[in-house]
Amino acid sequence: GGGPVGIGDVQGVEVSGNAGKLKKRKQVKIRIKMKMAQPEMDDGELDAKKVGNRIRRRKRAFQACYERELKRSSDLAGKVLLEVTVGSNGRVNSVEILENDLNASVGNCVRSKMRSIRFPKPDGGDEAIFTYPFVFSKG
């Protein structure tokens, strides 16, 4: 039977040589350029500068979308153009991909990150629509 284990029953395991050492994988630093533009306000009253600032604060999240796919396709570069509809409460109601020179994974990831941003409430109480270009390339 499986009775209690006394301390005398436990034996140490000896690790010798390199068994306990993990090999460090070299990480290659890739410089990435991401052009940050001002949003093009299409409809409604929303401060373009405030919108641009909210998007810039999430720059790393957008870059991560590109970096992940760059590992699979080293020559990946291009533009993702989004049309964003912001509701009267400042939440994103919809994000459409108007143009995508990259691949579907980057486009969908960028759209998803944009959808999660809270924007200022549009003046006048209506929804606001703007377009925003993301241009990615290796630097």
Where are these regions (language model features)?
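A generic structural signal for short, solvent-exposed coil/turn residues
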Residues: 4-7, 22, 26, 74, ...
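Short tight loops/turns at secondary-structure junctions
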Residues: 14, 26-44, 62, 72-102, ...
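Generic structural detector for well-ordered beta-strands
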Residues: 54, 83-85, 96, 133-137
